[in-house]
Amino acid sequence: MNAKSVIKPLRRPRLLALIAMLALNGCAYIPHDKVVTGPTTAQPGSPVLAGPNGSIFQTVQPMNYGYQPMFEDRRPRNIGDTLTIVLQENVSASKSSSANAARNGSSTFGVATTPRYLEGPLGNNRAALDATGTNDFSGKGGANANNTFSGTITVTVGQVLANGNLNVVGEKQIAINQGTEFIRFSGVVNPRTISGNNSVPSTQVADARIEYVGNGYINEAQNMGWLQRFFLNVSPF
């Protein structure tokens, strides 16, 4: 028994294992990266009760999430307060480019007098040379993109920043037959942009993250099958 006959059986399991790994990699499901991460709601903490000091006016009051001033509007200001976001996203972009190039050239060569000993091979205008060349190029490209998102979603205040801005987050789930639609939103809201009906347009929200996804048989129909993913990953083209 030579060494080659021993090495070949050892290589076959490794080759089969490598093919199996490639097949599993090609059939693997590509997960969806979430735009809105972390918890999608916030609950206010328990208030700390302070003992009365016998005065009518309490100089130091603990944070009371149910307290609303008499002469101020009822805008969200604490963790757990709700706020309505009016989704008004409309993004449109277009780009076009074109290029043209042309080049023409011609050349003529001739011998007016042909020597006598060259009259045979070069006679009858055989010494004349005429060349013409033309090169044309034309290129054109364009791209258009339009995105529109409208609707409303009520979010909660998850964090009050040091400058008074509100970090809001929220989620809405809609179940229709055998599918569920998820709308998630997060961003930073300036309290000055909140209107009297406790709403703010999404165009005035900083660091806005809007996610609209779903699951169910409709969403599965939009995904590529495992066999198609396999051939797409192993194909060199």
From Swiss-Prot:
The basal body constitutes a major portion of the flagellar organelle and consists of four rings (L,P,S, and M) mounted on a central rod. One of its GO terms (molecular function) is cytoskeletal motor activity. The keyword Lipoprotein applies. This is Flagellar L-ring protein. A lipid is attached at residue 27 (S-diacylglycerol cysteine). It comes from the Bacteria. Disulfide bonds: none annotated. GO terms for cellular component: bacterial-type flagellum basal body, distal rod, L ring; cell outer membrane. The keyword Transmembrane does not apply. Belongs to the FlgH family. It is a lipid-anchor. InterPro entries: Flag_Lring (IPR000527). It is found in: Cell outer membrane; Bacterial flagellum basal body. Coiled coil: none annotated.
